[in-house]
Structures are given as structure tokens and as C-alpha cells.
Design a protein with these regions (language model features):
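Structural motif
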Residues: 22, 50-51, 86-89, 132
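Active-site beta-strand/loop microenvironment that shapes enzyme catalytic pockets
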Residues: 74-118
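Helix N-cap motif at beta-to-alpha junctions
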Residues: 28-30, 136-139, 168-175
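Short amphipathic alpha-helix segments
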Residues: 134-152, 176
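Non-DNA-binding regulatory cores of transcription-related proteins
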Residues: 153-171
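Terminal alpha-helical anchor/extension segments at protein ends
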Residues: 106-118, 132-134, 183-198
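C-terminal regulatory domains involved in ligand/effector binding and gene-expression control
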Residues: 1-70, 156, 181-198
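Short glycine-/aliphatic-rich beta-strand segments at the starts of folded cytosolic domains
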Residues: 122-137
């Protein structure tokens, strides 16, 4: 799954109506009212503000007075298809005087949201296994050289009589250490979520 790194705002105009879409990093559904009000301040006097958000298993959408099915549910489907979560999309629509009809209105809302989504910058959310290892300084130097090639990262390192390191990667870290003849103690610490720029 990917999540926005920063807010992205895009605008399209169709038959004198303006559609301003906001893609917003969003991690807490309790913050919805605050974010929604902020968008309304950024785009005052818009006629409607349909929205959708996904945070984990929580999904919510609304059309804010637009004809049913014009935007919100379609935003959710698009976000799911594109693998986007922890995100809020809100489109401020300024009516230009010409009715678009429901099919064109739906397409235009989707086009505006897709533009904000497709041009956004993202983090990839991944779960990594954590392991605590105790190393000699020689083992540390060997591991520091080979670990990145196997996708293993040093998350925390303490230097003392020996080196204590917290490594993140996949389940193969213990066997990788054995392959390198690193025989220090290796203890699993669980999992951690990481964000990587994409």
C-alpha cells in the first residue's frame, strides 16, 4: 500500500465549472472534520465538497449534496484500485452555470481526483521484521558491507565492548547471519512498519 508524502492540489475546468481536488495524507479518522473544514477555507464559496478517505480498514465517503454516486464512492474505488491508503481526497466544485449531467459530472470528479492522485508523491508502507543482534566489531564490519545487498537495514546501533544492533528485513535475517559466519545472539523483536519513498 502507498500513502501520500505531502498534500497535492490539482484543478480542472469543464464548461465553466471548476473542480479543485486535494489529496491529503490522513492517518486518523477523528481528524476528518478539521481537515474537511480546512479544505473549505482553502476553497471558499465552492458549491460542493465531496470526499473519501481510507485509513486501515476504515473507509468513508460522501457527495456533499451532489447527485448520489457522483463522487465519493467512486473515489474510494479509485483509491483501492491504485493501492492508496491513509489518504483523504476532497474536491471543491464551483458550479459554472451549465449543468454537466450525471455521467459527465461523475467523469469530471474522477478526472480531477485522478489528477491529484496520479501526480502525488508517495511512501510505500511495508512491514519489516526486527531482530536484535550482538556482534564483534569484525562481524559488524562484515555485516555492514553485506546487509544492504540483502535488503537488511541497521535501525539502531550501540557501540560498547561489543556492537548491539537492531536490524530490519525479512524472516531470513538469522540464516543470512549464519551464511556470513556471524554467530552472535540473534533475537526476534517483532515487526515494524516502514515508509519508503517511491
Amino acid at each position: 500500500m502507498k500513502t501520500p508524502r505531502e498534500e497535492n492540489v490539482k484543478e480542472i475546468d469543464v464548461m465553466a465549472s471548476r473542480f479543485v481536488s486535494y489529496l491529503i495524507p490522513f492517518t486518523n479518522p477523528d481528524d476528518f472534520e478539521e481537515q474537511y473544514a480546512r479544505v473549505k477555507k482553502l476553497s471558499p464559496k465552492a458549491d460542493h465538497y465531496p470526499y473519501a478517505y481510507i485509513v486501515g480498514d476504515i473507509q468513508k465517503s460522501g457527495d456533499d449534496g451532489e447527485p448520489g454516486g457522483a463522487a465519493g464512492r467512486n473515489y474510494l474505488h479509485m483509491m483501492e484500485e491504485k493501492g492508496i491508503g491513509r489518504a483523504l481526497i476532497v474536491t471543491a466544485r464551483y458550479f459554472g452555470g451549465t449543468k454537466l449531467g450525471l455521467p459527465r459530472l461523475r467523469r469530471t470528479f474522477l478526472e480531477a481526483a485522478a489528477l491529484a492522485i496520479d501526480t502525488g508523491k508517495y511512501f510505500e508502507i511495508t512491514m519489516r521484521k526486527l531482530f536484535k543482534v550482538e556482534l564483534s566489531y569484525r562481524e559488524y564490519e562484515i555485516l555492514k558491507h553485506y546487509a544492504p545487498k540483502d535488503g537488511i537495514r541497521f535501525e539502531k546501533t550501540l557501540f560498547g565492548e561489543k556492537v548491539e544492533a537492531t536490524l530490519s528485513g525479512n524472516d531470513t535475517i538469522p540464516s543470512f547471519l549464519k551464511k556470513l559466519a556471524i554467530l552472535g545472539e540473534c533475537s526476534p523483536l517483532g515487526e515494524a512498519e516502514t515508509l519508503e519513498e517511491i
